[in-house]
Regions:
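Juxtamembrane intracellular "pre-TM" segments in multi-pass secondary transporters
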Residues: 1-13, 37
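Short amphipathic helix-loop junctions that connect adjacent transmembrane helices
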Residues: 28-47, 170
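Helix-to-loop junctions at the C-terminal end of transmembrane segments
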Residues: 59-80
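A membrane-interface helix-boundary motif in multi-pass transporters
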Residues: 75-80, 167-193
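C-terminal ends and interior cores of transmembrane alpha-helices
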Residues: 83-104
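Multi-pass alpha-helical transporter architecture, strongest
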Residues: 97-100, 183-207
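Hydrophobic core of transmembrane alpha-helices in multi-pass small-molecule transporters
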Residues: 104-126, 130
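A late C-terminal transmembrane helix in Major Facilitator Superfamily
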Residues: 140-172
Length: 207
């Protein structure tokens, strides 16, 4: 309760929950979405998931290299990666939704998913770095409590994300006759969540 009362810690907790919820909600629906909308086989969608993970790895390395190269501005660099990663993730998800409505081979789904992976990887690792940096700020002897609070927020959001993502698609599918539109609605919701999460980090920078 005392840690939650700290403005920075409380706001960062909400950021962690919101961003990781959006991050994990796409996990279980991306491959079925590509299979249904673009007519890809299971093998092709699995390969696409591998491409996304490759993008994530690239994003992680890019973020790590930039913080090493600009050690004197680590906090600023981390916040840039967090905000940029969230915004780019939102854009990629919105483009996925748009591509699903277009369908066919006209949409560069490979590039879209790869860039989404880069955005996800960079923001996720930067968020962990920001978490460790912010843990030492505020009242002393609460570092562990802050990390525990943020870790709990991350764990809960990860547990809920995959479940809520699939449920949301099913519910949207009952309302919308077009499966691509149902998936698109969920992707747009995730994009909005990423944008909101980014605004929370912006507010932290203003303090």
């Amino acid at each position: 309760k005392e840690v939650w009362g700290e403005v920075q810690a409380g706001r960062f907790t909400i950021f962690v929950f919101a961003s990781m919820l959006a991050y994990s909600a796409q996990d279980l629906i991306l491959e079925p979405f590509v299979g249904l909308t673009f007519g890809w086989t299971v093998g092709e969608t699995t390969a696409l998931a591998g491409m996304q993970h490759g993008g994530m790895l690239l994003g992680m390395f890019a973020m790590a290299f930039s913080t090493y190269a600009f050690k004197s501005k680590t906090r600023h660099i981390l916040h840039l990666w967090i905000k940029g990663g969230c915004v780019l993730s939102a854009i990629c998800l919105a483009l996925l939704a748009t591509g699903g409505l277009i369908g066919g081979n006209a949409w560069p789904i490979n590039i879209n998913v790869f860039v989404l992976g880069v955005a996800n990887g960079s923001f996720a690792v930067a968020a962990i770095g920001g978490m460790m940096m912010l843990a030492s700020e505020g009242r002393s002897q609460r570092d562990g409590l802050r990390m525990g609070l943020w870790g709990a927020a991350q764990a809960i959001s990860f547990a809920l994300g995959g479940f809520l993502g699939t449920v949301a698609v099913d519910v949207a599918g009952l309302w919308l006759e077009n499966p691509a539109a149902a998936y698109g609605l969920v992707f747009f919701a995730e994009a909005a969540l990423f944008v909101w999460a980014s605004s929370l980090i912006f507010n932290l920078d203003q303090q």
